[in-house]
A protein has these predicted regions:
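N-terminal cap/lid segment of alpha/beta-hydrolase-fold proteins
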Residues: 21-77
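Short, surface-exposed "cap/lid" segments of acyl-processing enzymes
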Residues: 70-124
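Alpha/beta-hydrolase active-site loop
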Residues: 142-166
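Alpha/beta-hydrolase fold nucleophile elbow
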Residues: 167-181
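Conserved hydrolase catalytic core segment
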Residues: 184-218
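Alpha/beta-hydrolase
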Residues: 222-377, 381-386
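Catalytic active-site module of serine/aspartate enzymes centered on a nucleophile-bearing elbow/loop
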Residues: 367, 404-446
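Conserved alpha/beta-hydrolase "acid-adjacent" motif
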Residues: 386-393
Length: 446
């Protein structure tokens, strides 16, 4: 394993310190290979590997693999592999494997589980911040974590995954890079970096950006202006010494956890997490349940006074009450939402959020200079009530000619505030039919 990490790092132009390499070991030690394995359902299992990628205790990523087995500890060979990068708030398991352990959906009802059941070799990463433990007070170790840091980590993890696939007899087949939300931004940054390498050394055979924009097109000048406002606000916070947090403020995951926990345990109690009349004059304190449903169905309210990335942006589609506030979720089970909130990672590094806003603002960033040289097939998946069609322009920055757009919508664009949401892509009851099955068909065809 140490040799695999060293080789993968070298491919990215990174030399890891000896102590980092020696710590790039599998979690657990219950078997000779040293990996941690959890049987999920049928012949599908989940493996975790913990990789030290820097000098401090926090410079760690977790590599995940969800795969069919021929037997315990024997991953089946597969000609198709997908490597997943999560976005803000939730790590790999919460984002892509949320069905496992859920009280509301069967274990196979998540994207990673579904693809693995269908024979795809699924890999993914927990970025460094996803593993920072609750209670951390000093975030100076995040000072130099940037999009470049995360893109490099993805490259190392991709390299390890490829070497392990080769060791398992997967000599042929493609590896597709899937990035959701800010994970798509990291994906663009990684592909820009990989374009420096000779074609024979490139690791990604296809790109699946899900519901995110890195640049806005000419007709979306308002969204670019909003990004500039967010960039200025977050830059001010960084100049004042903040190193952790994001659009929801410091420790964003702690708020998300509290919202989910209280909605599940005390749904009818007035929420003490927000001020009275937070949703308008005379509305009083929302119940814990109402706060969770509004946070999911009208997510832009959490960003105030900042504007959201696009108009009507939300995590989950909903139907409104008499005041126009979300009252019932349309596509995702309410209890599943409450579980989801409780699985958020407590903290996040701030730099990549600032850099993303700079990119969307149209400022010069070091992450798109070579995107025109990226010519792998692309599948853009947009949620009509998330980023949706606003993310399609970003794909045109690539040099790819084989481009497919999967637009997940149930309503006209004018009703985007109620339509399929950013996280419905993974949590909705019908996501398997609307999203995952066409995604699988694209993977099999490429």
């Amino acid at each position: 394993m140490r040799r695999a990490v060293s080789q993968a790092a070298a491919l990215q132009g990174v030399t890891l310190a000896e102590d980092a390499v020696s710590s790039a070991a599998f979690l657990g030690s219950s078997n000779p290979g040293g990996s941690e394995r959890v049987a999920l359902f049928g012949a599908v299992a989940h493996y975790r590997y913990r990789l030290r990628v820097g000098p401090t205790e926090h410079d760690v990523v977790t590599l995940h693999r969800v795969v069919k087995e021929d037997g315990a500890w024997r991953p089946a060979r597969s000609s198709r592999a997908v490597f997943m990068v999560h976005g803000d708030g939730w790590g790999f398991e919460a984002a892509f494997l949320s069905s496992v352990g859920s009280a509301y959906v069967p274990p196979e009802q998540s994207l990673a589980a579904y693809l693995a059941k269908e024979g795809v070799d699924v890999w993914g990463i927990d970025l460094r911040w996803a593993g920072v433990p609750e209670g951390t007070q000093d975030f100076r170790f995040m000072k130099n974590w940037t999009l470049e840091t995360h893109a490099t980590d993805v490259g190392v993890a991709l390299g390890v995954a490829r070497l392990m696939r080769l060791a398992g007899g997967n000599f042929l087949g493609n590896m597709h890079l899937l990035g959701w939300s800010r994970g798509a931004v990291v994906g663009y940054a990684y592909l820009n970096r990989e374009a420096l390498l000779p074609r024979a050394l490139r690791q990604v055979d296809g790109f699946i950006p899900m519901d995110m924009a890195v640049r806005f097109g000419p007709r979306d000048a308002q969204q670019q202006a909003w990004a500039c406002e967010r960039f200025e606000a977050l830059s001010d916070a960084r100049r004042e010494g903040r190193l952790e947090g994001g659009l929801l403020g410091p420790a964003p995951g702690m708020m998300l956890r509290a919202i989910g926990q209280l909605a599940a345990s005390e749904p009818t109690a007035p929420s003490l997490l927000v001020e009275p009349d937070v949703f308008g004059p005379g509305t009083g304190r929302p119940t814990n349940r109402k706060l969770a449903v509004v946070a999911a169905g009208a997510t832009s309210v959490l960003f105030a006074p900042l504007q959201p990335i696009v108009p009507g942006y939300h995590l989950l589609g909903s139907t409104p009450d008499a005041m126009g506030l979300p009252e019932q979720l349309t596509f995702t089970r309410e209890g599943y939402l409450f579980e989801y909130g409780q699985r958020a990672a407590p903290y996040q590094s701030l730099n990549e959020v600032v850099e993303t806003e700079a990119w969307a603002c149209g400022l010069d960033v070091p992450y798109d200079d070579r995107l025109r040289h990226v010519k792998v097939p692309v599948l853009y998946v947009g949620a009509a009530g998330g980023v949706g069609r606003y993310g399609e322009h970003s794909v045109t920055l690539l040099g790819s000619r084989d481009v497919t757009v999967l637009d997940i919508r149930t309503l006209p664009e004018a009703a985007r505030a109620l339509d399929y949401g950013h996280a419905d892509l993974f949590l909705a009851d019908d996501a398997r039919v609307r999203v995952w099955r066409p995604l699988l068909q694209w993977v099999r065809a490429h």
